[in-house]
């Protein structure tokens, strides 16, 4: 009976977590614009690097998503990277980090 019960409980997956951190369509567009314009002002409008490092999926491939999320929210002391916690929720930061690692979408 325990085996049957265990099978009936859905497994937690990365897809379920990603879906939970997906913003509403209107908010998603706001976040895309924020990253392209505000982050792009230092990291380059195409996020290929500028005053700040590149934010391409290749450049971020070895960084854990949780690290990127924390940098977005809290900044990097001693650098020009500011904290965005006052404007972004943890869910927003998780979505941005995930999308940066996938190859950030263009604004529609």
Indicate residue ranges for each PLM-predicted region.
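Alpha-helix initiation/capping motif
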Residues: 20, 24, 28, 44, ...
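Electrostatic cytochrome c docking/interface patches
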Residues: 7-34, 104-108
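Extracytoplasmic electron-transfer domains, predominantly the class I c-type cytochrome c fold
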Residues: 57-106
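Sequence/structural segment immediately N-terminal to covalent heme-attachment motifs in c-type
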Residues: 24-48, 67-74
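Sec-dependent N-terminal signal peptides
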Residues: 1-3
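Short cysteine/histidine-rich zinc-coordinating motifs and their immediately flanking basic loops
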Residues: 51-56
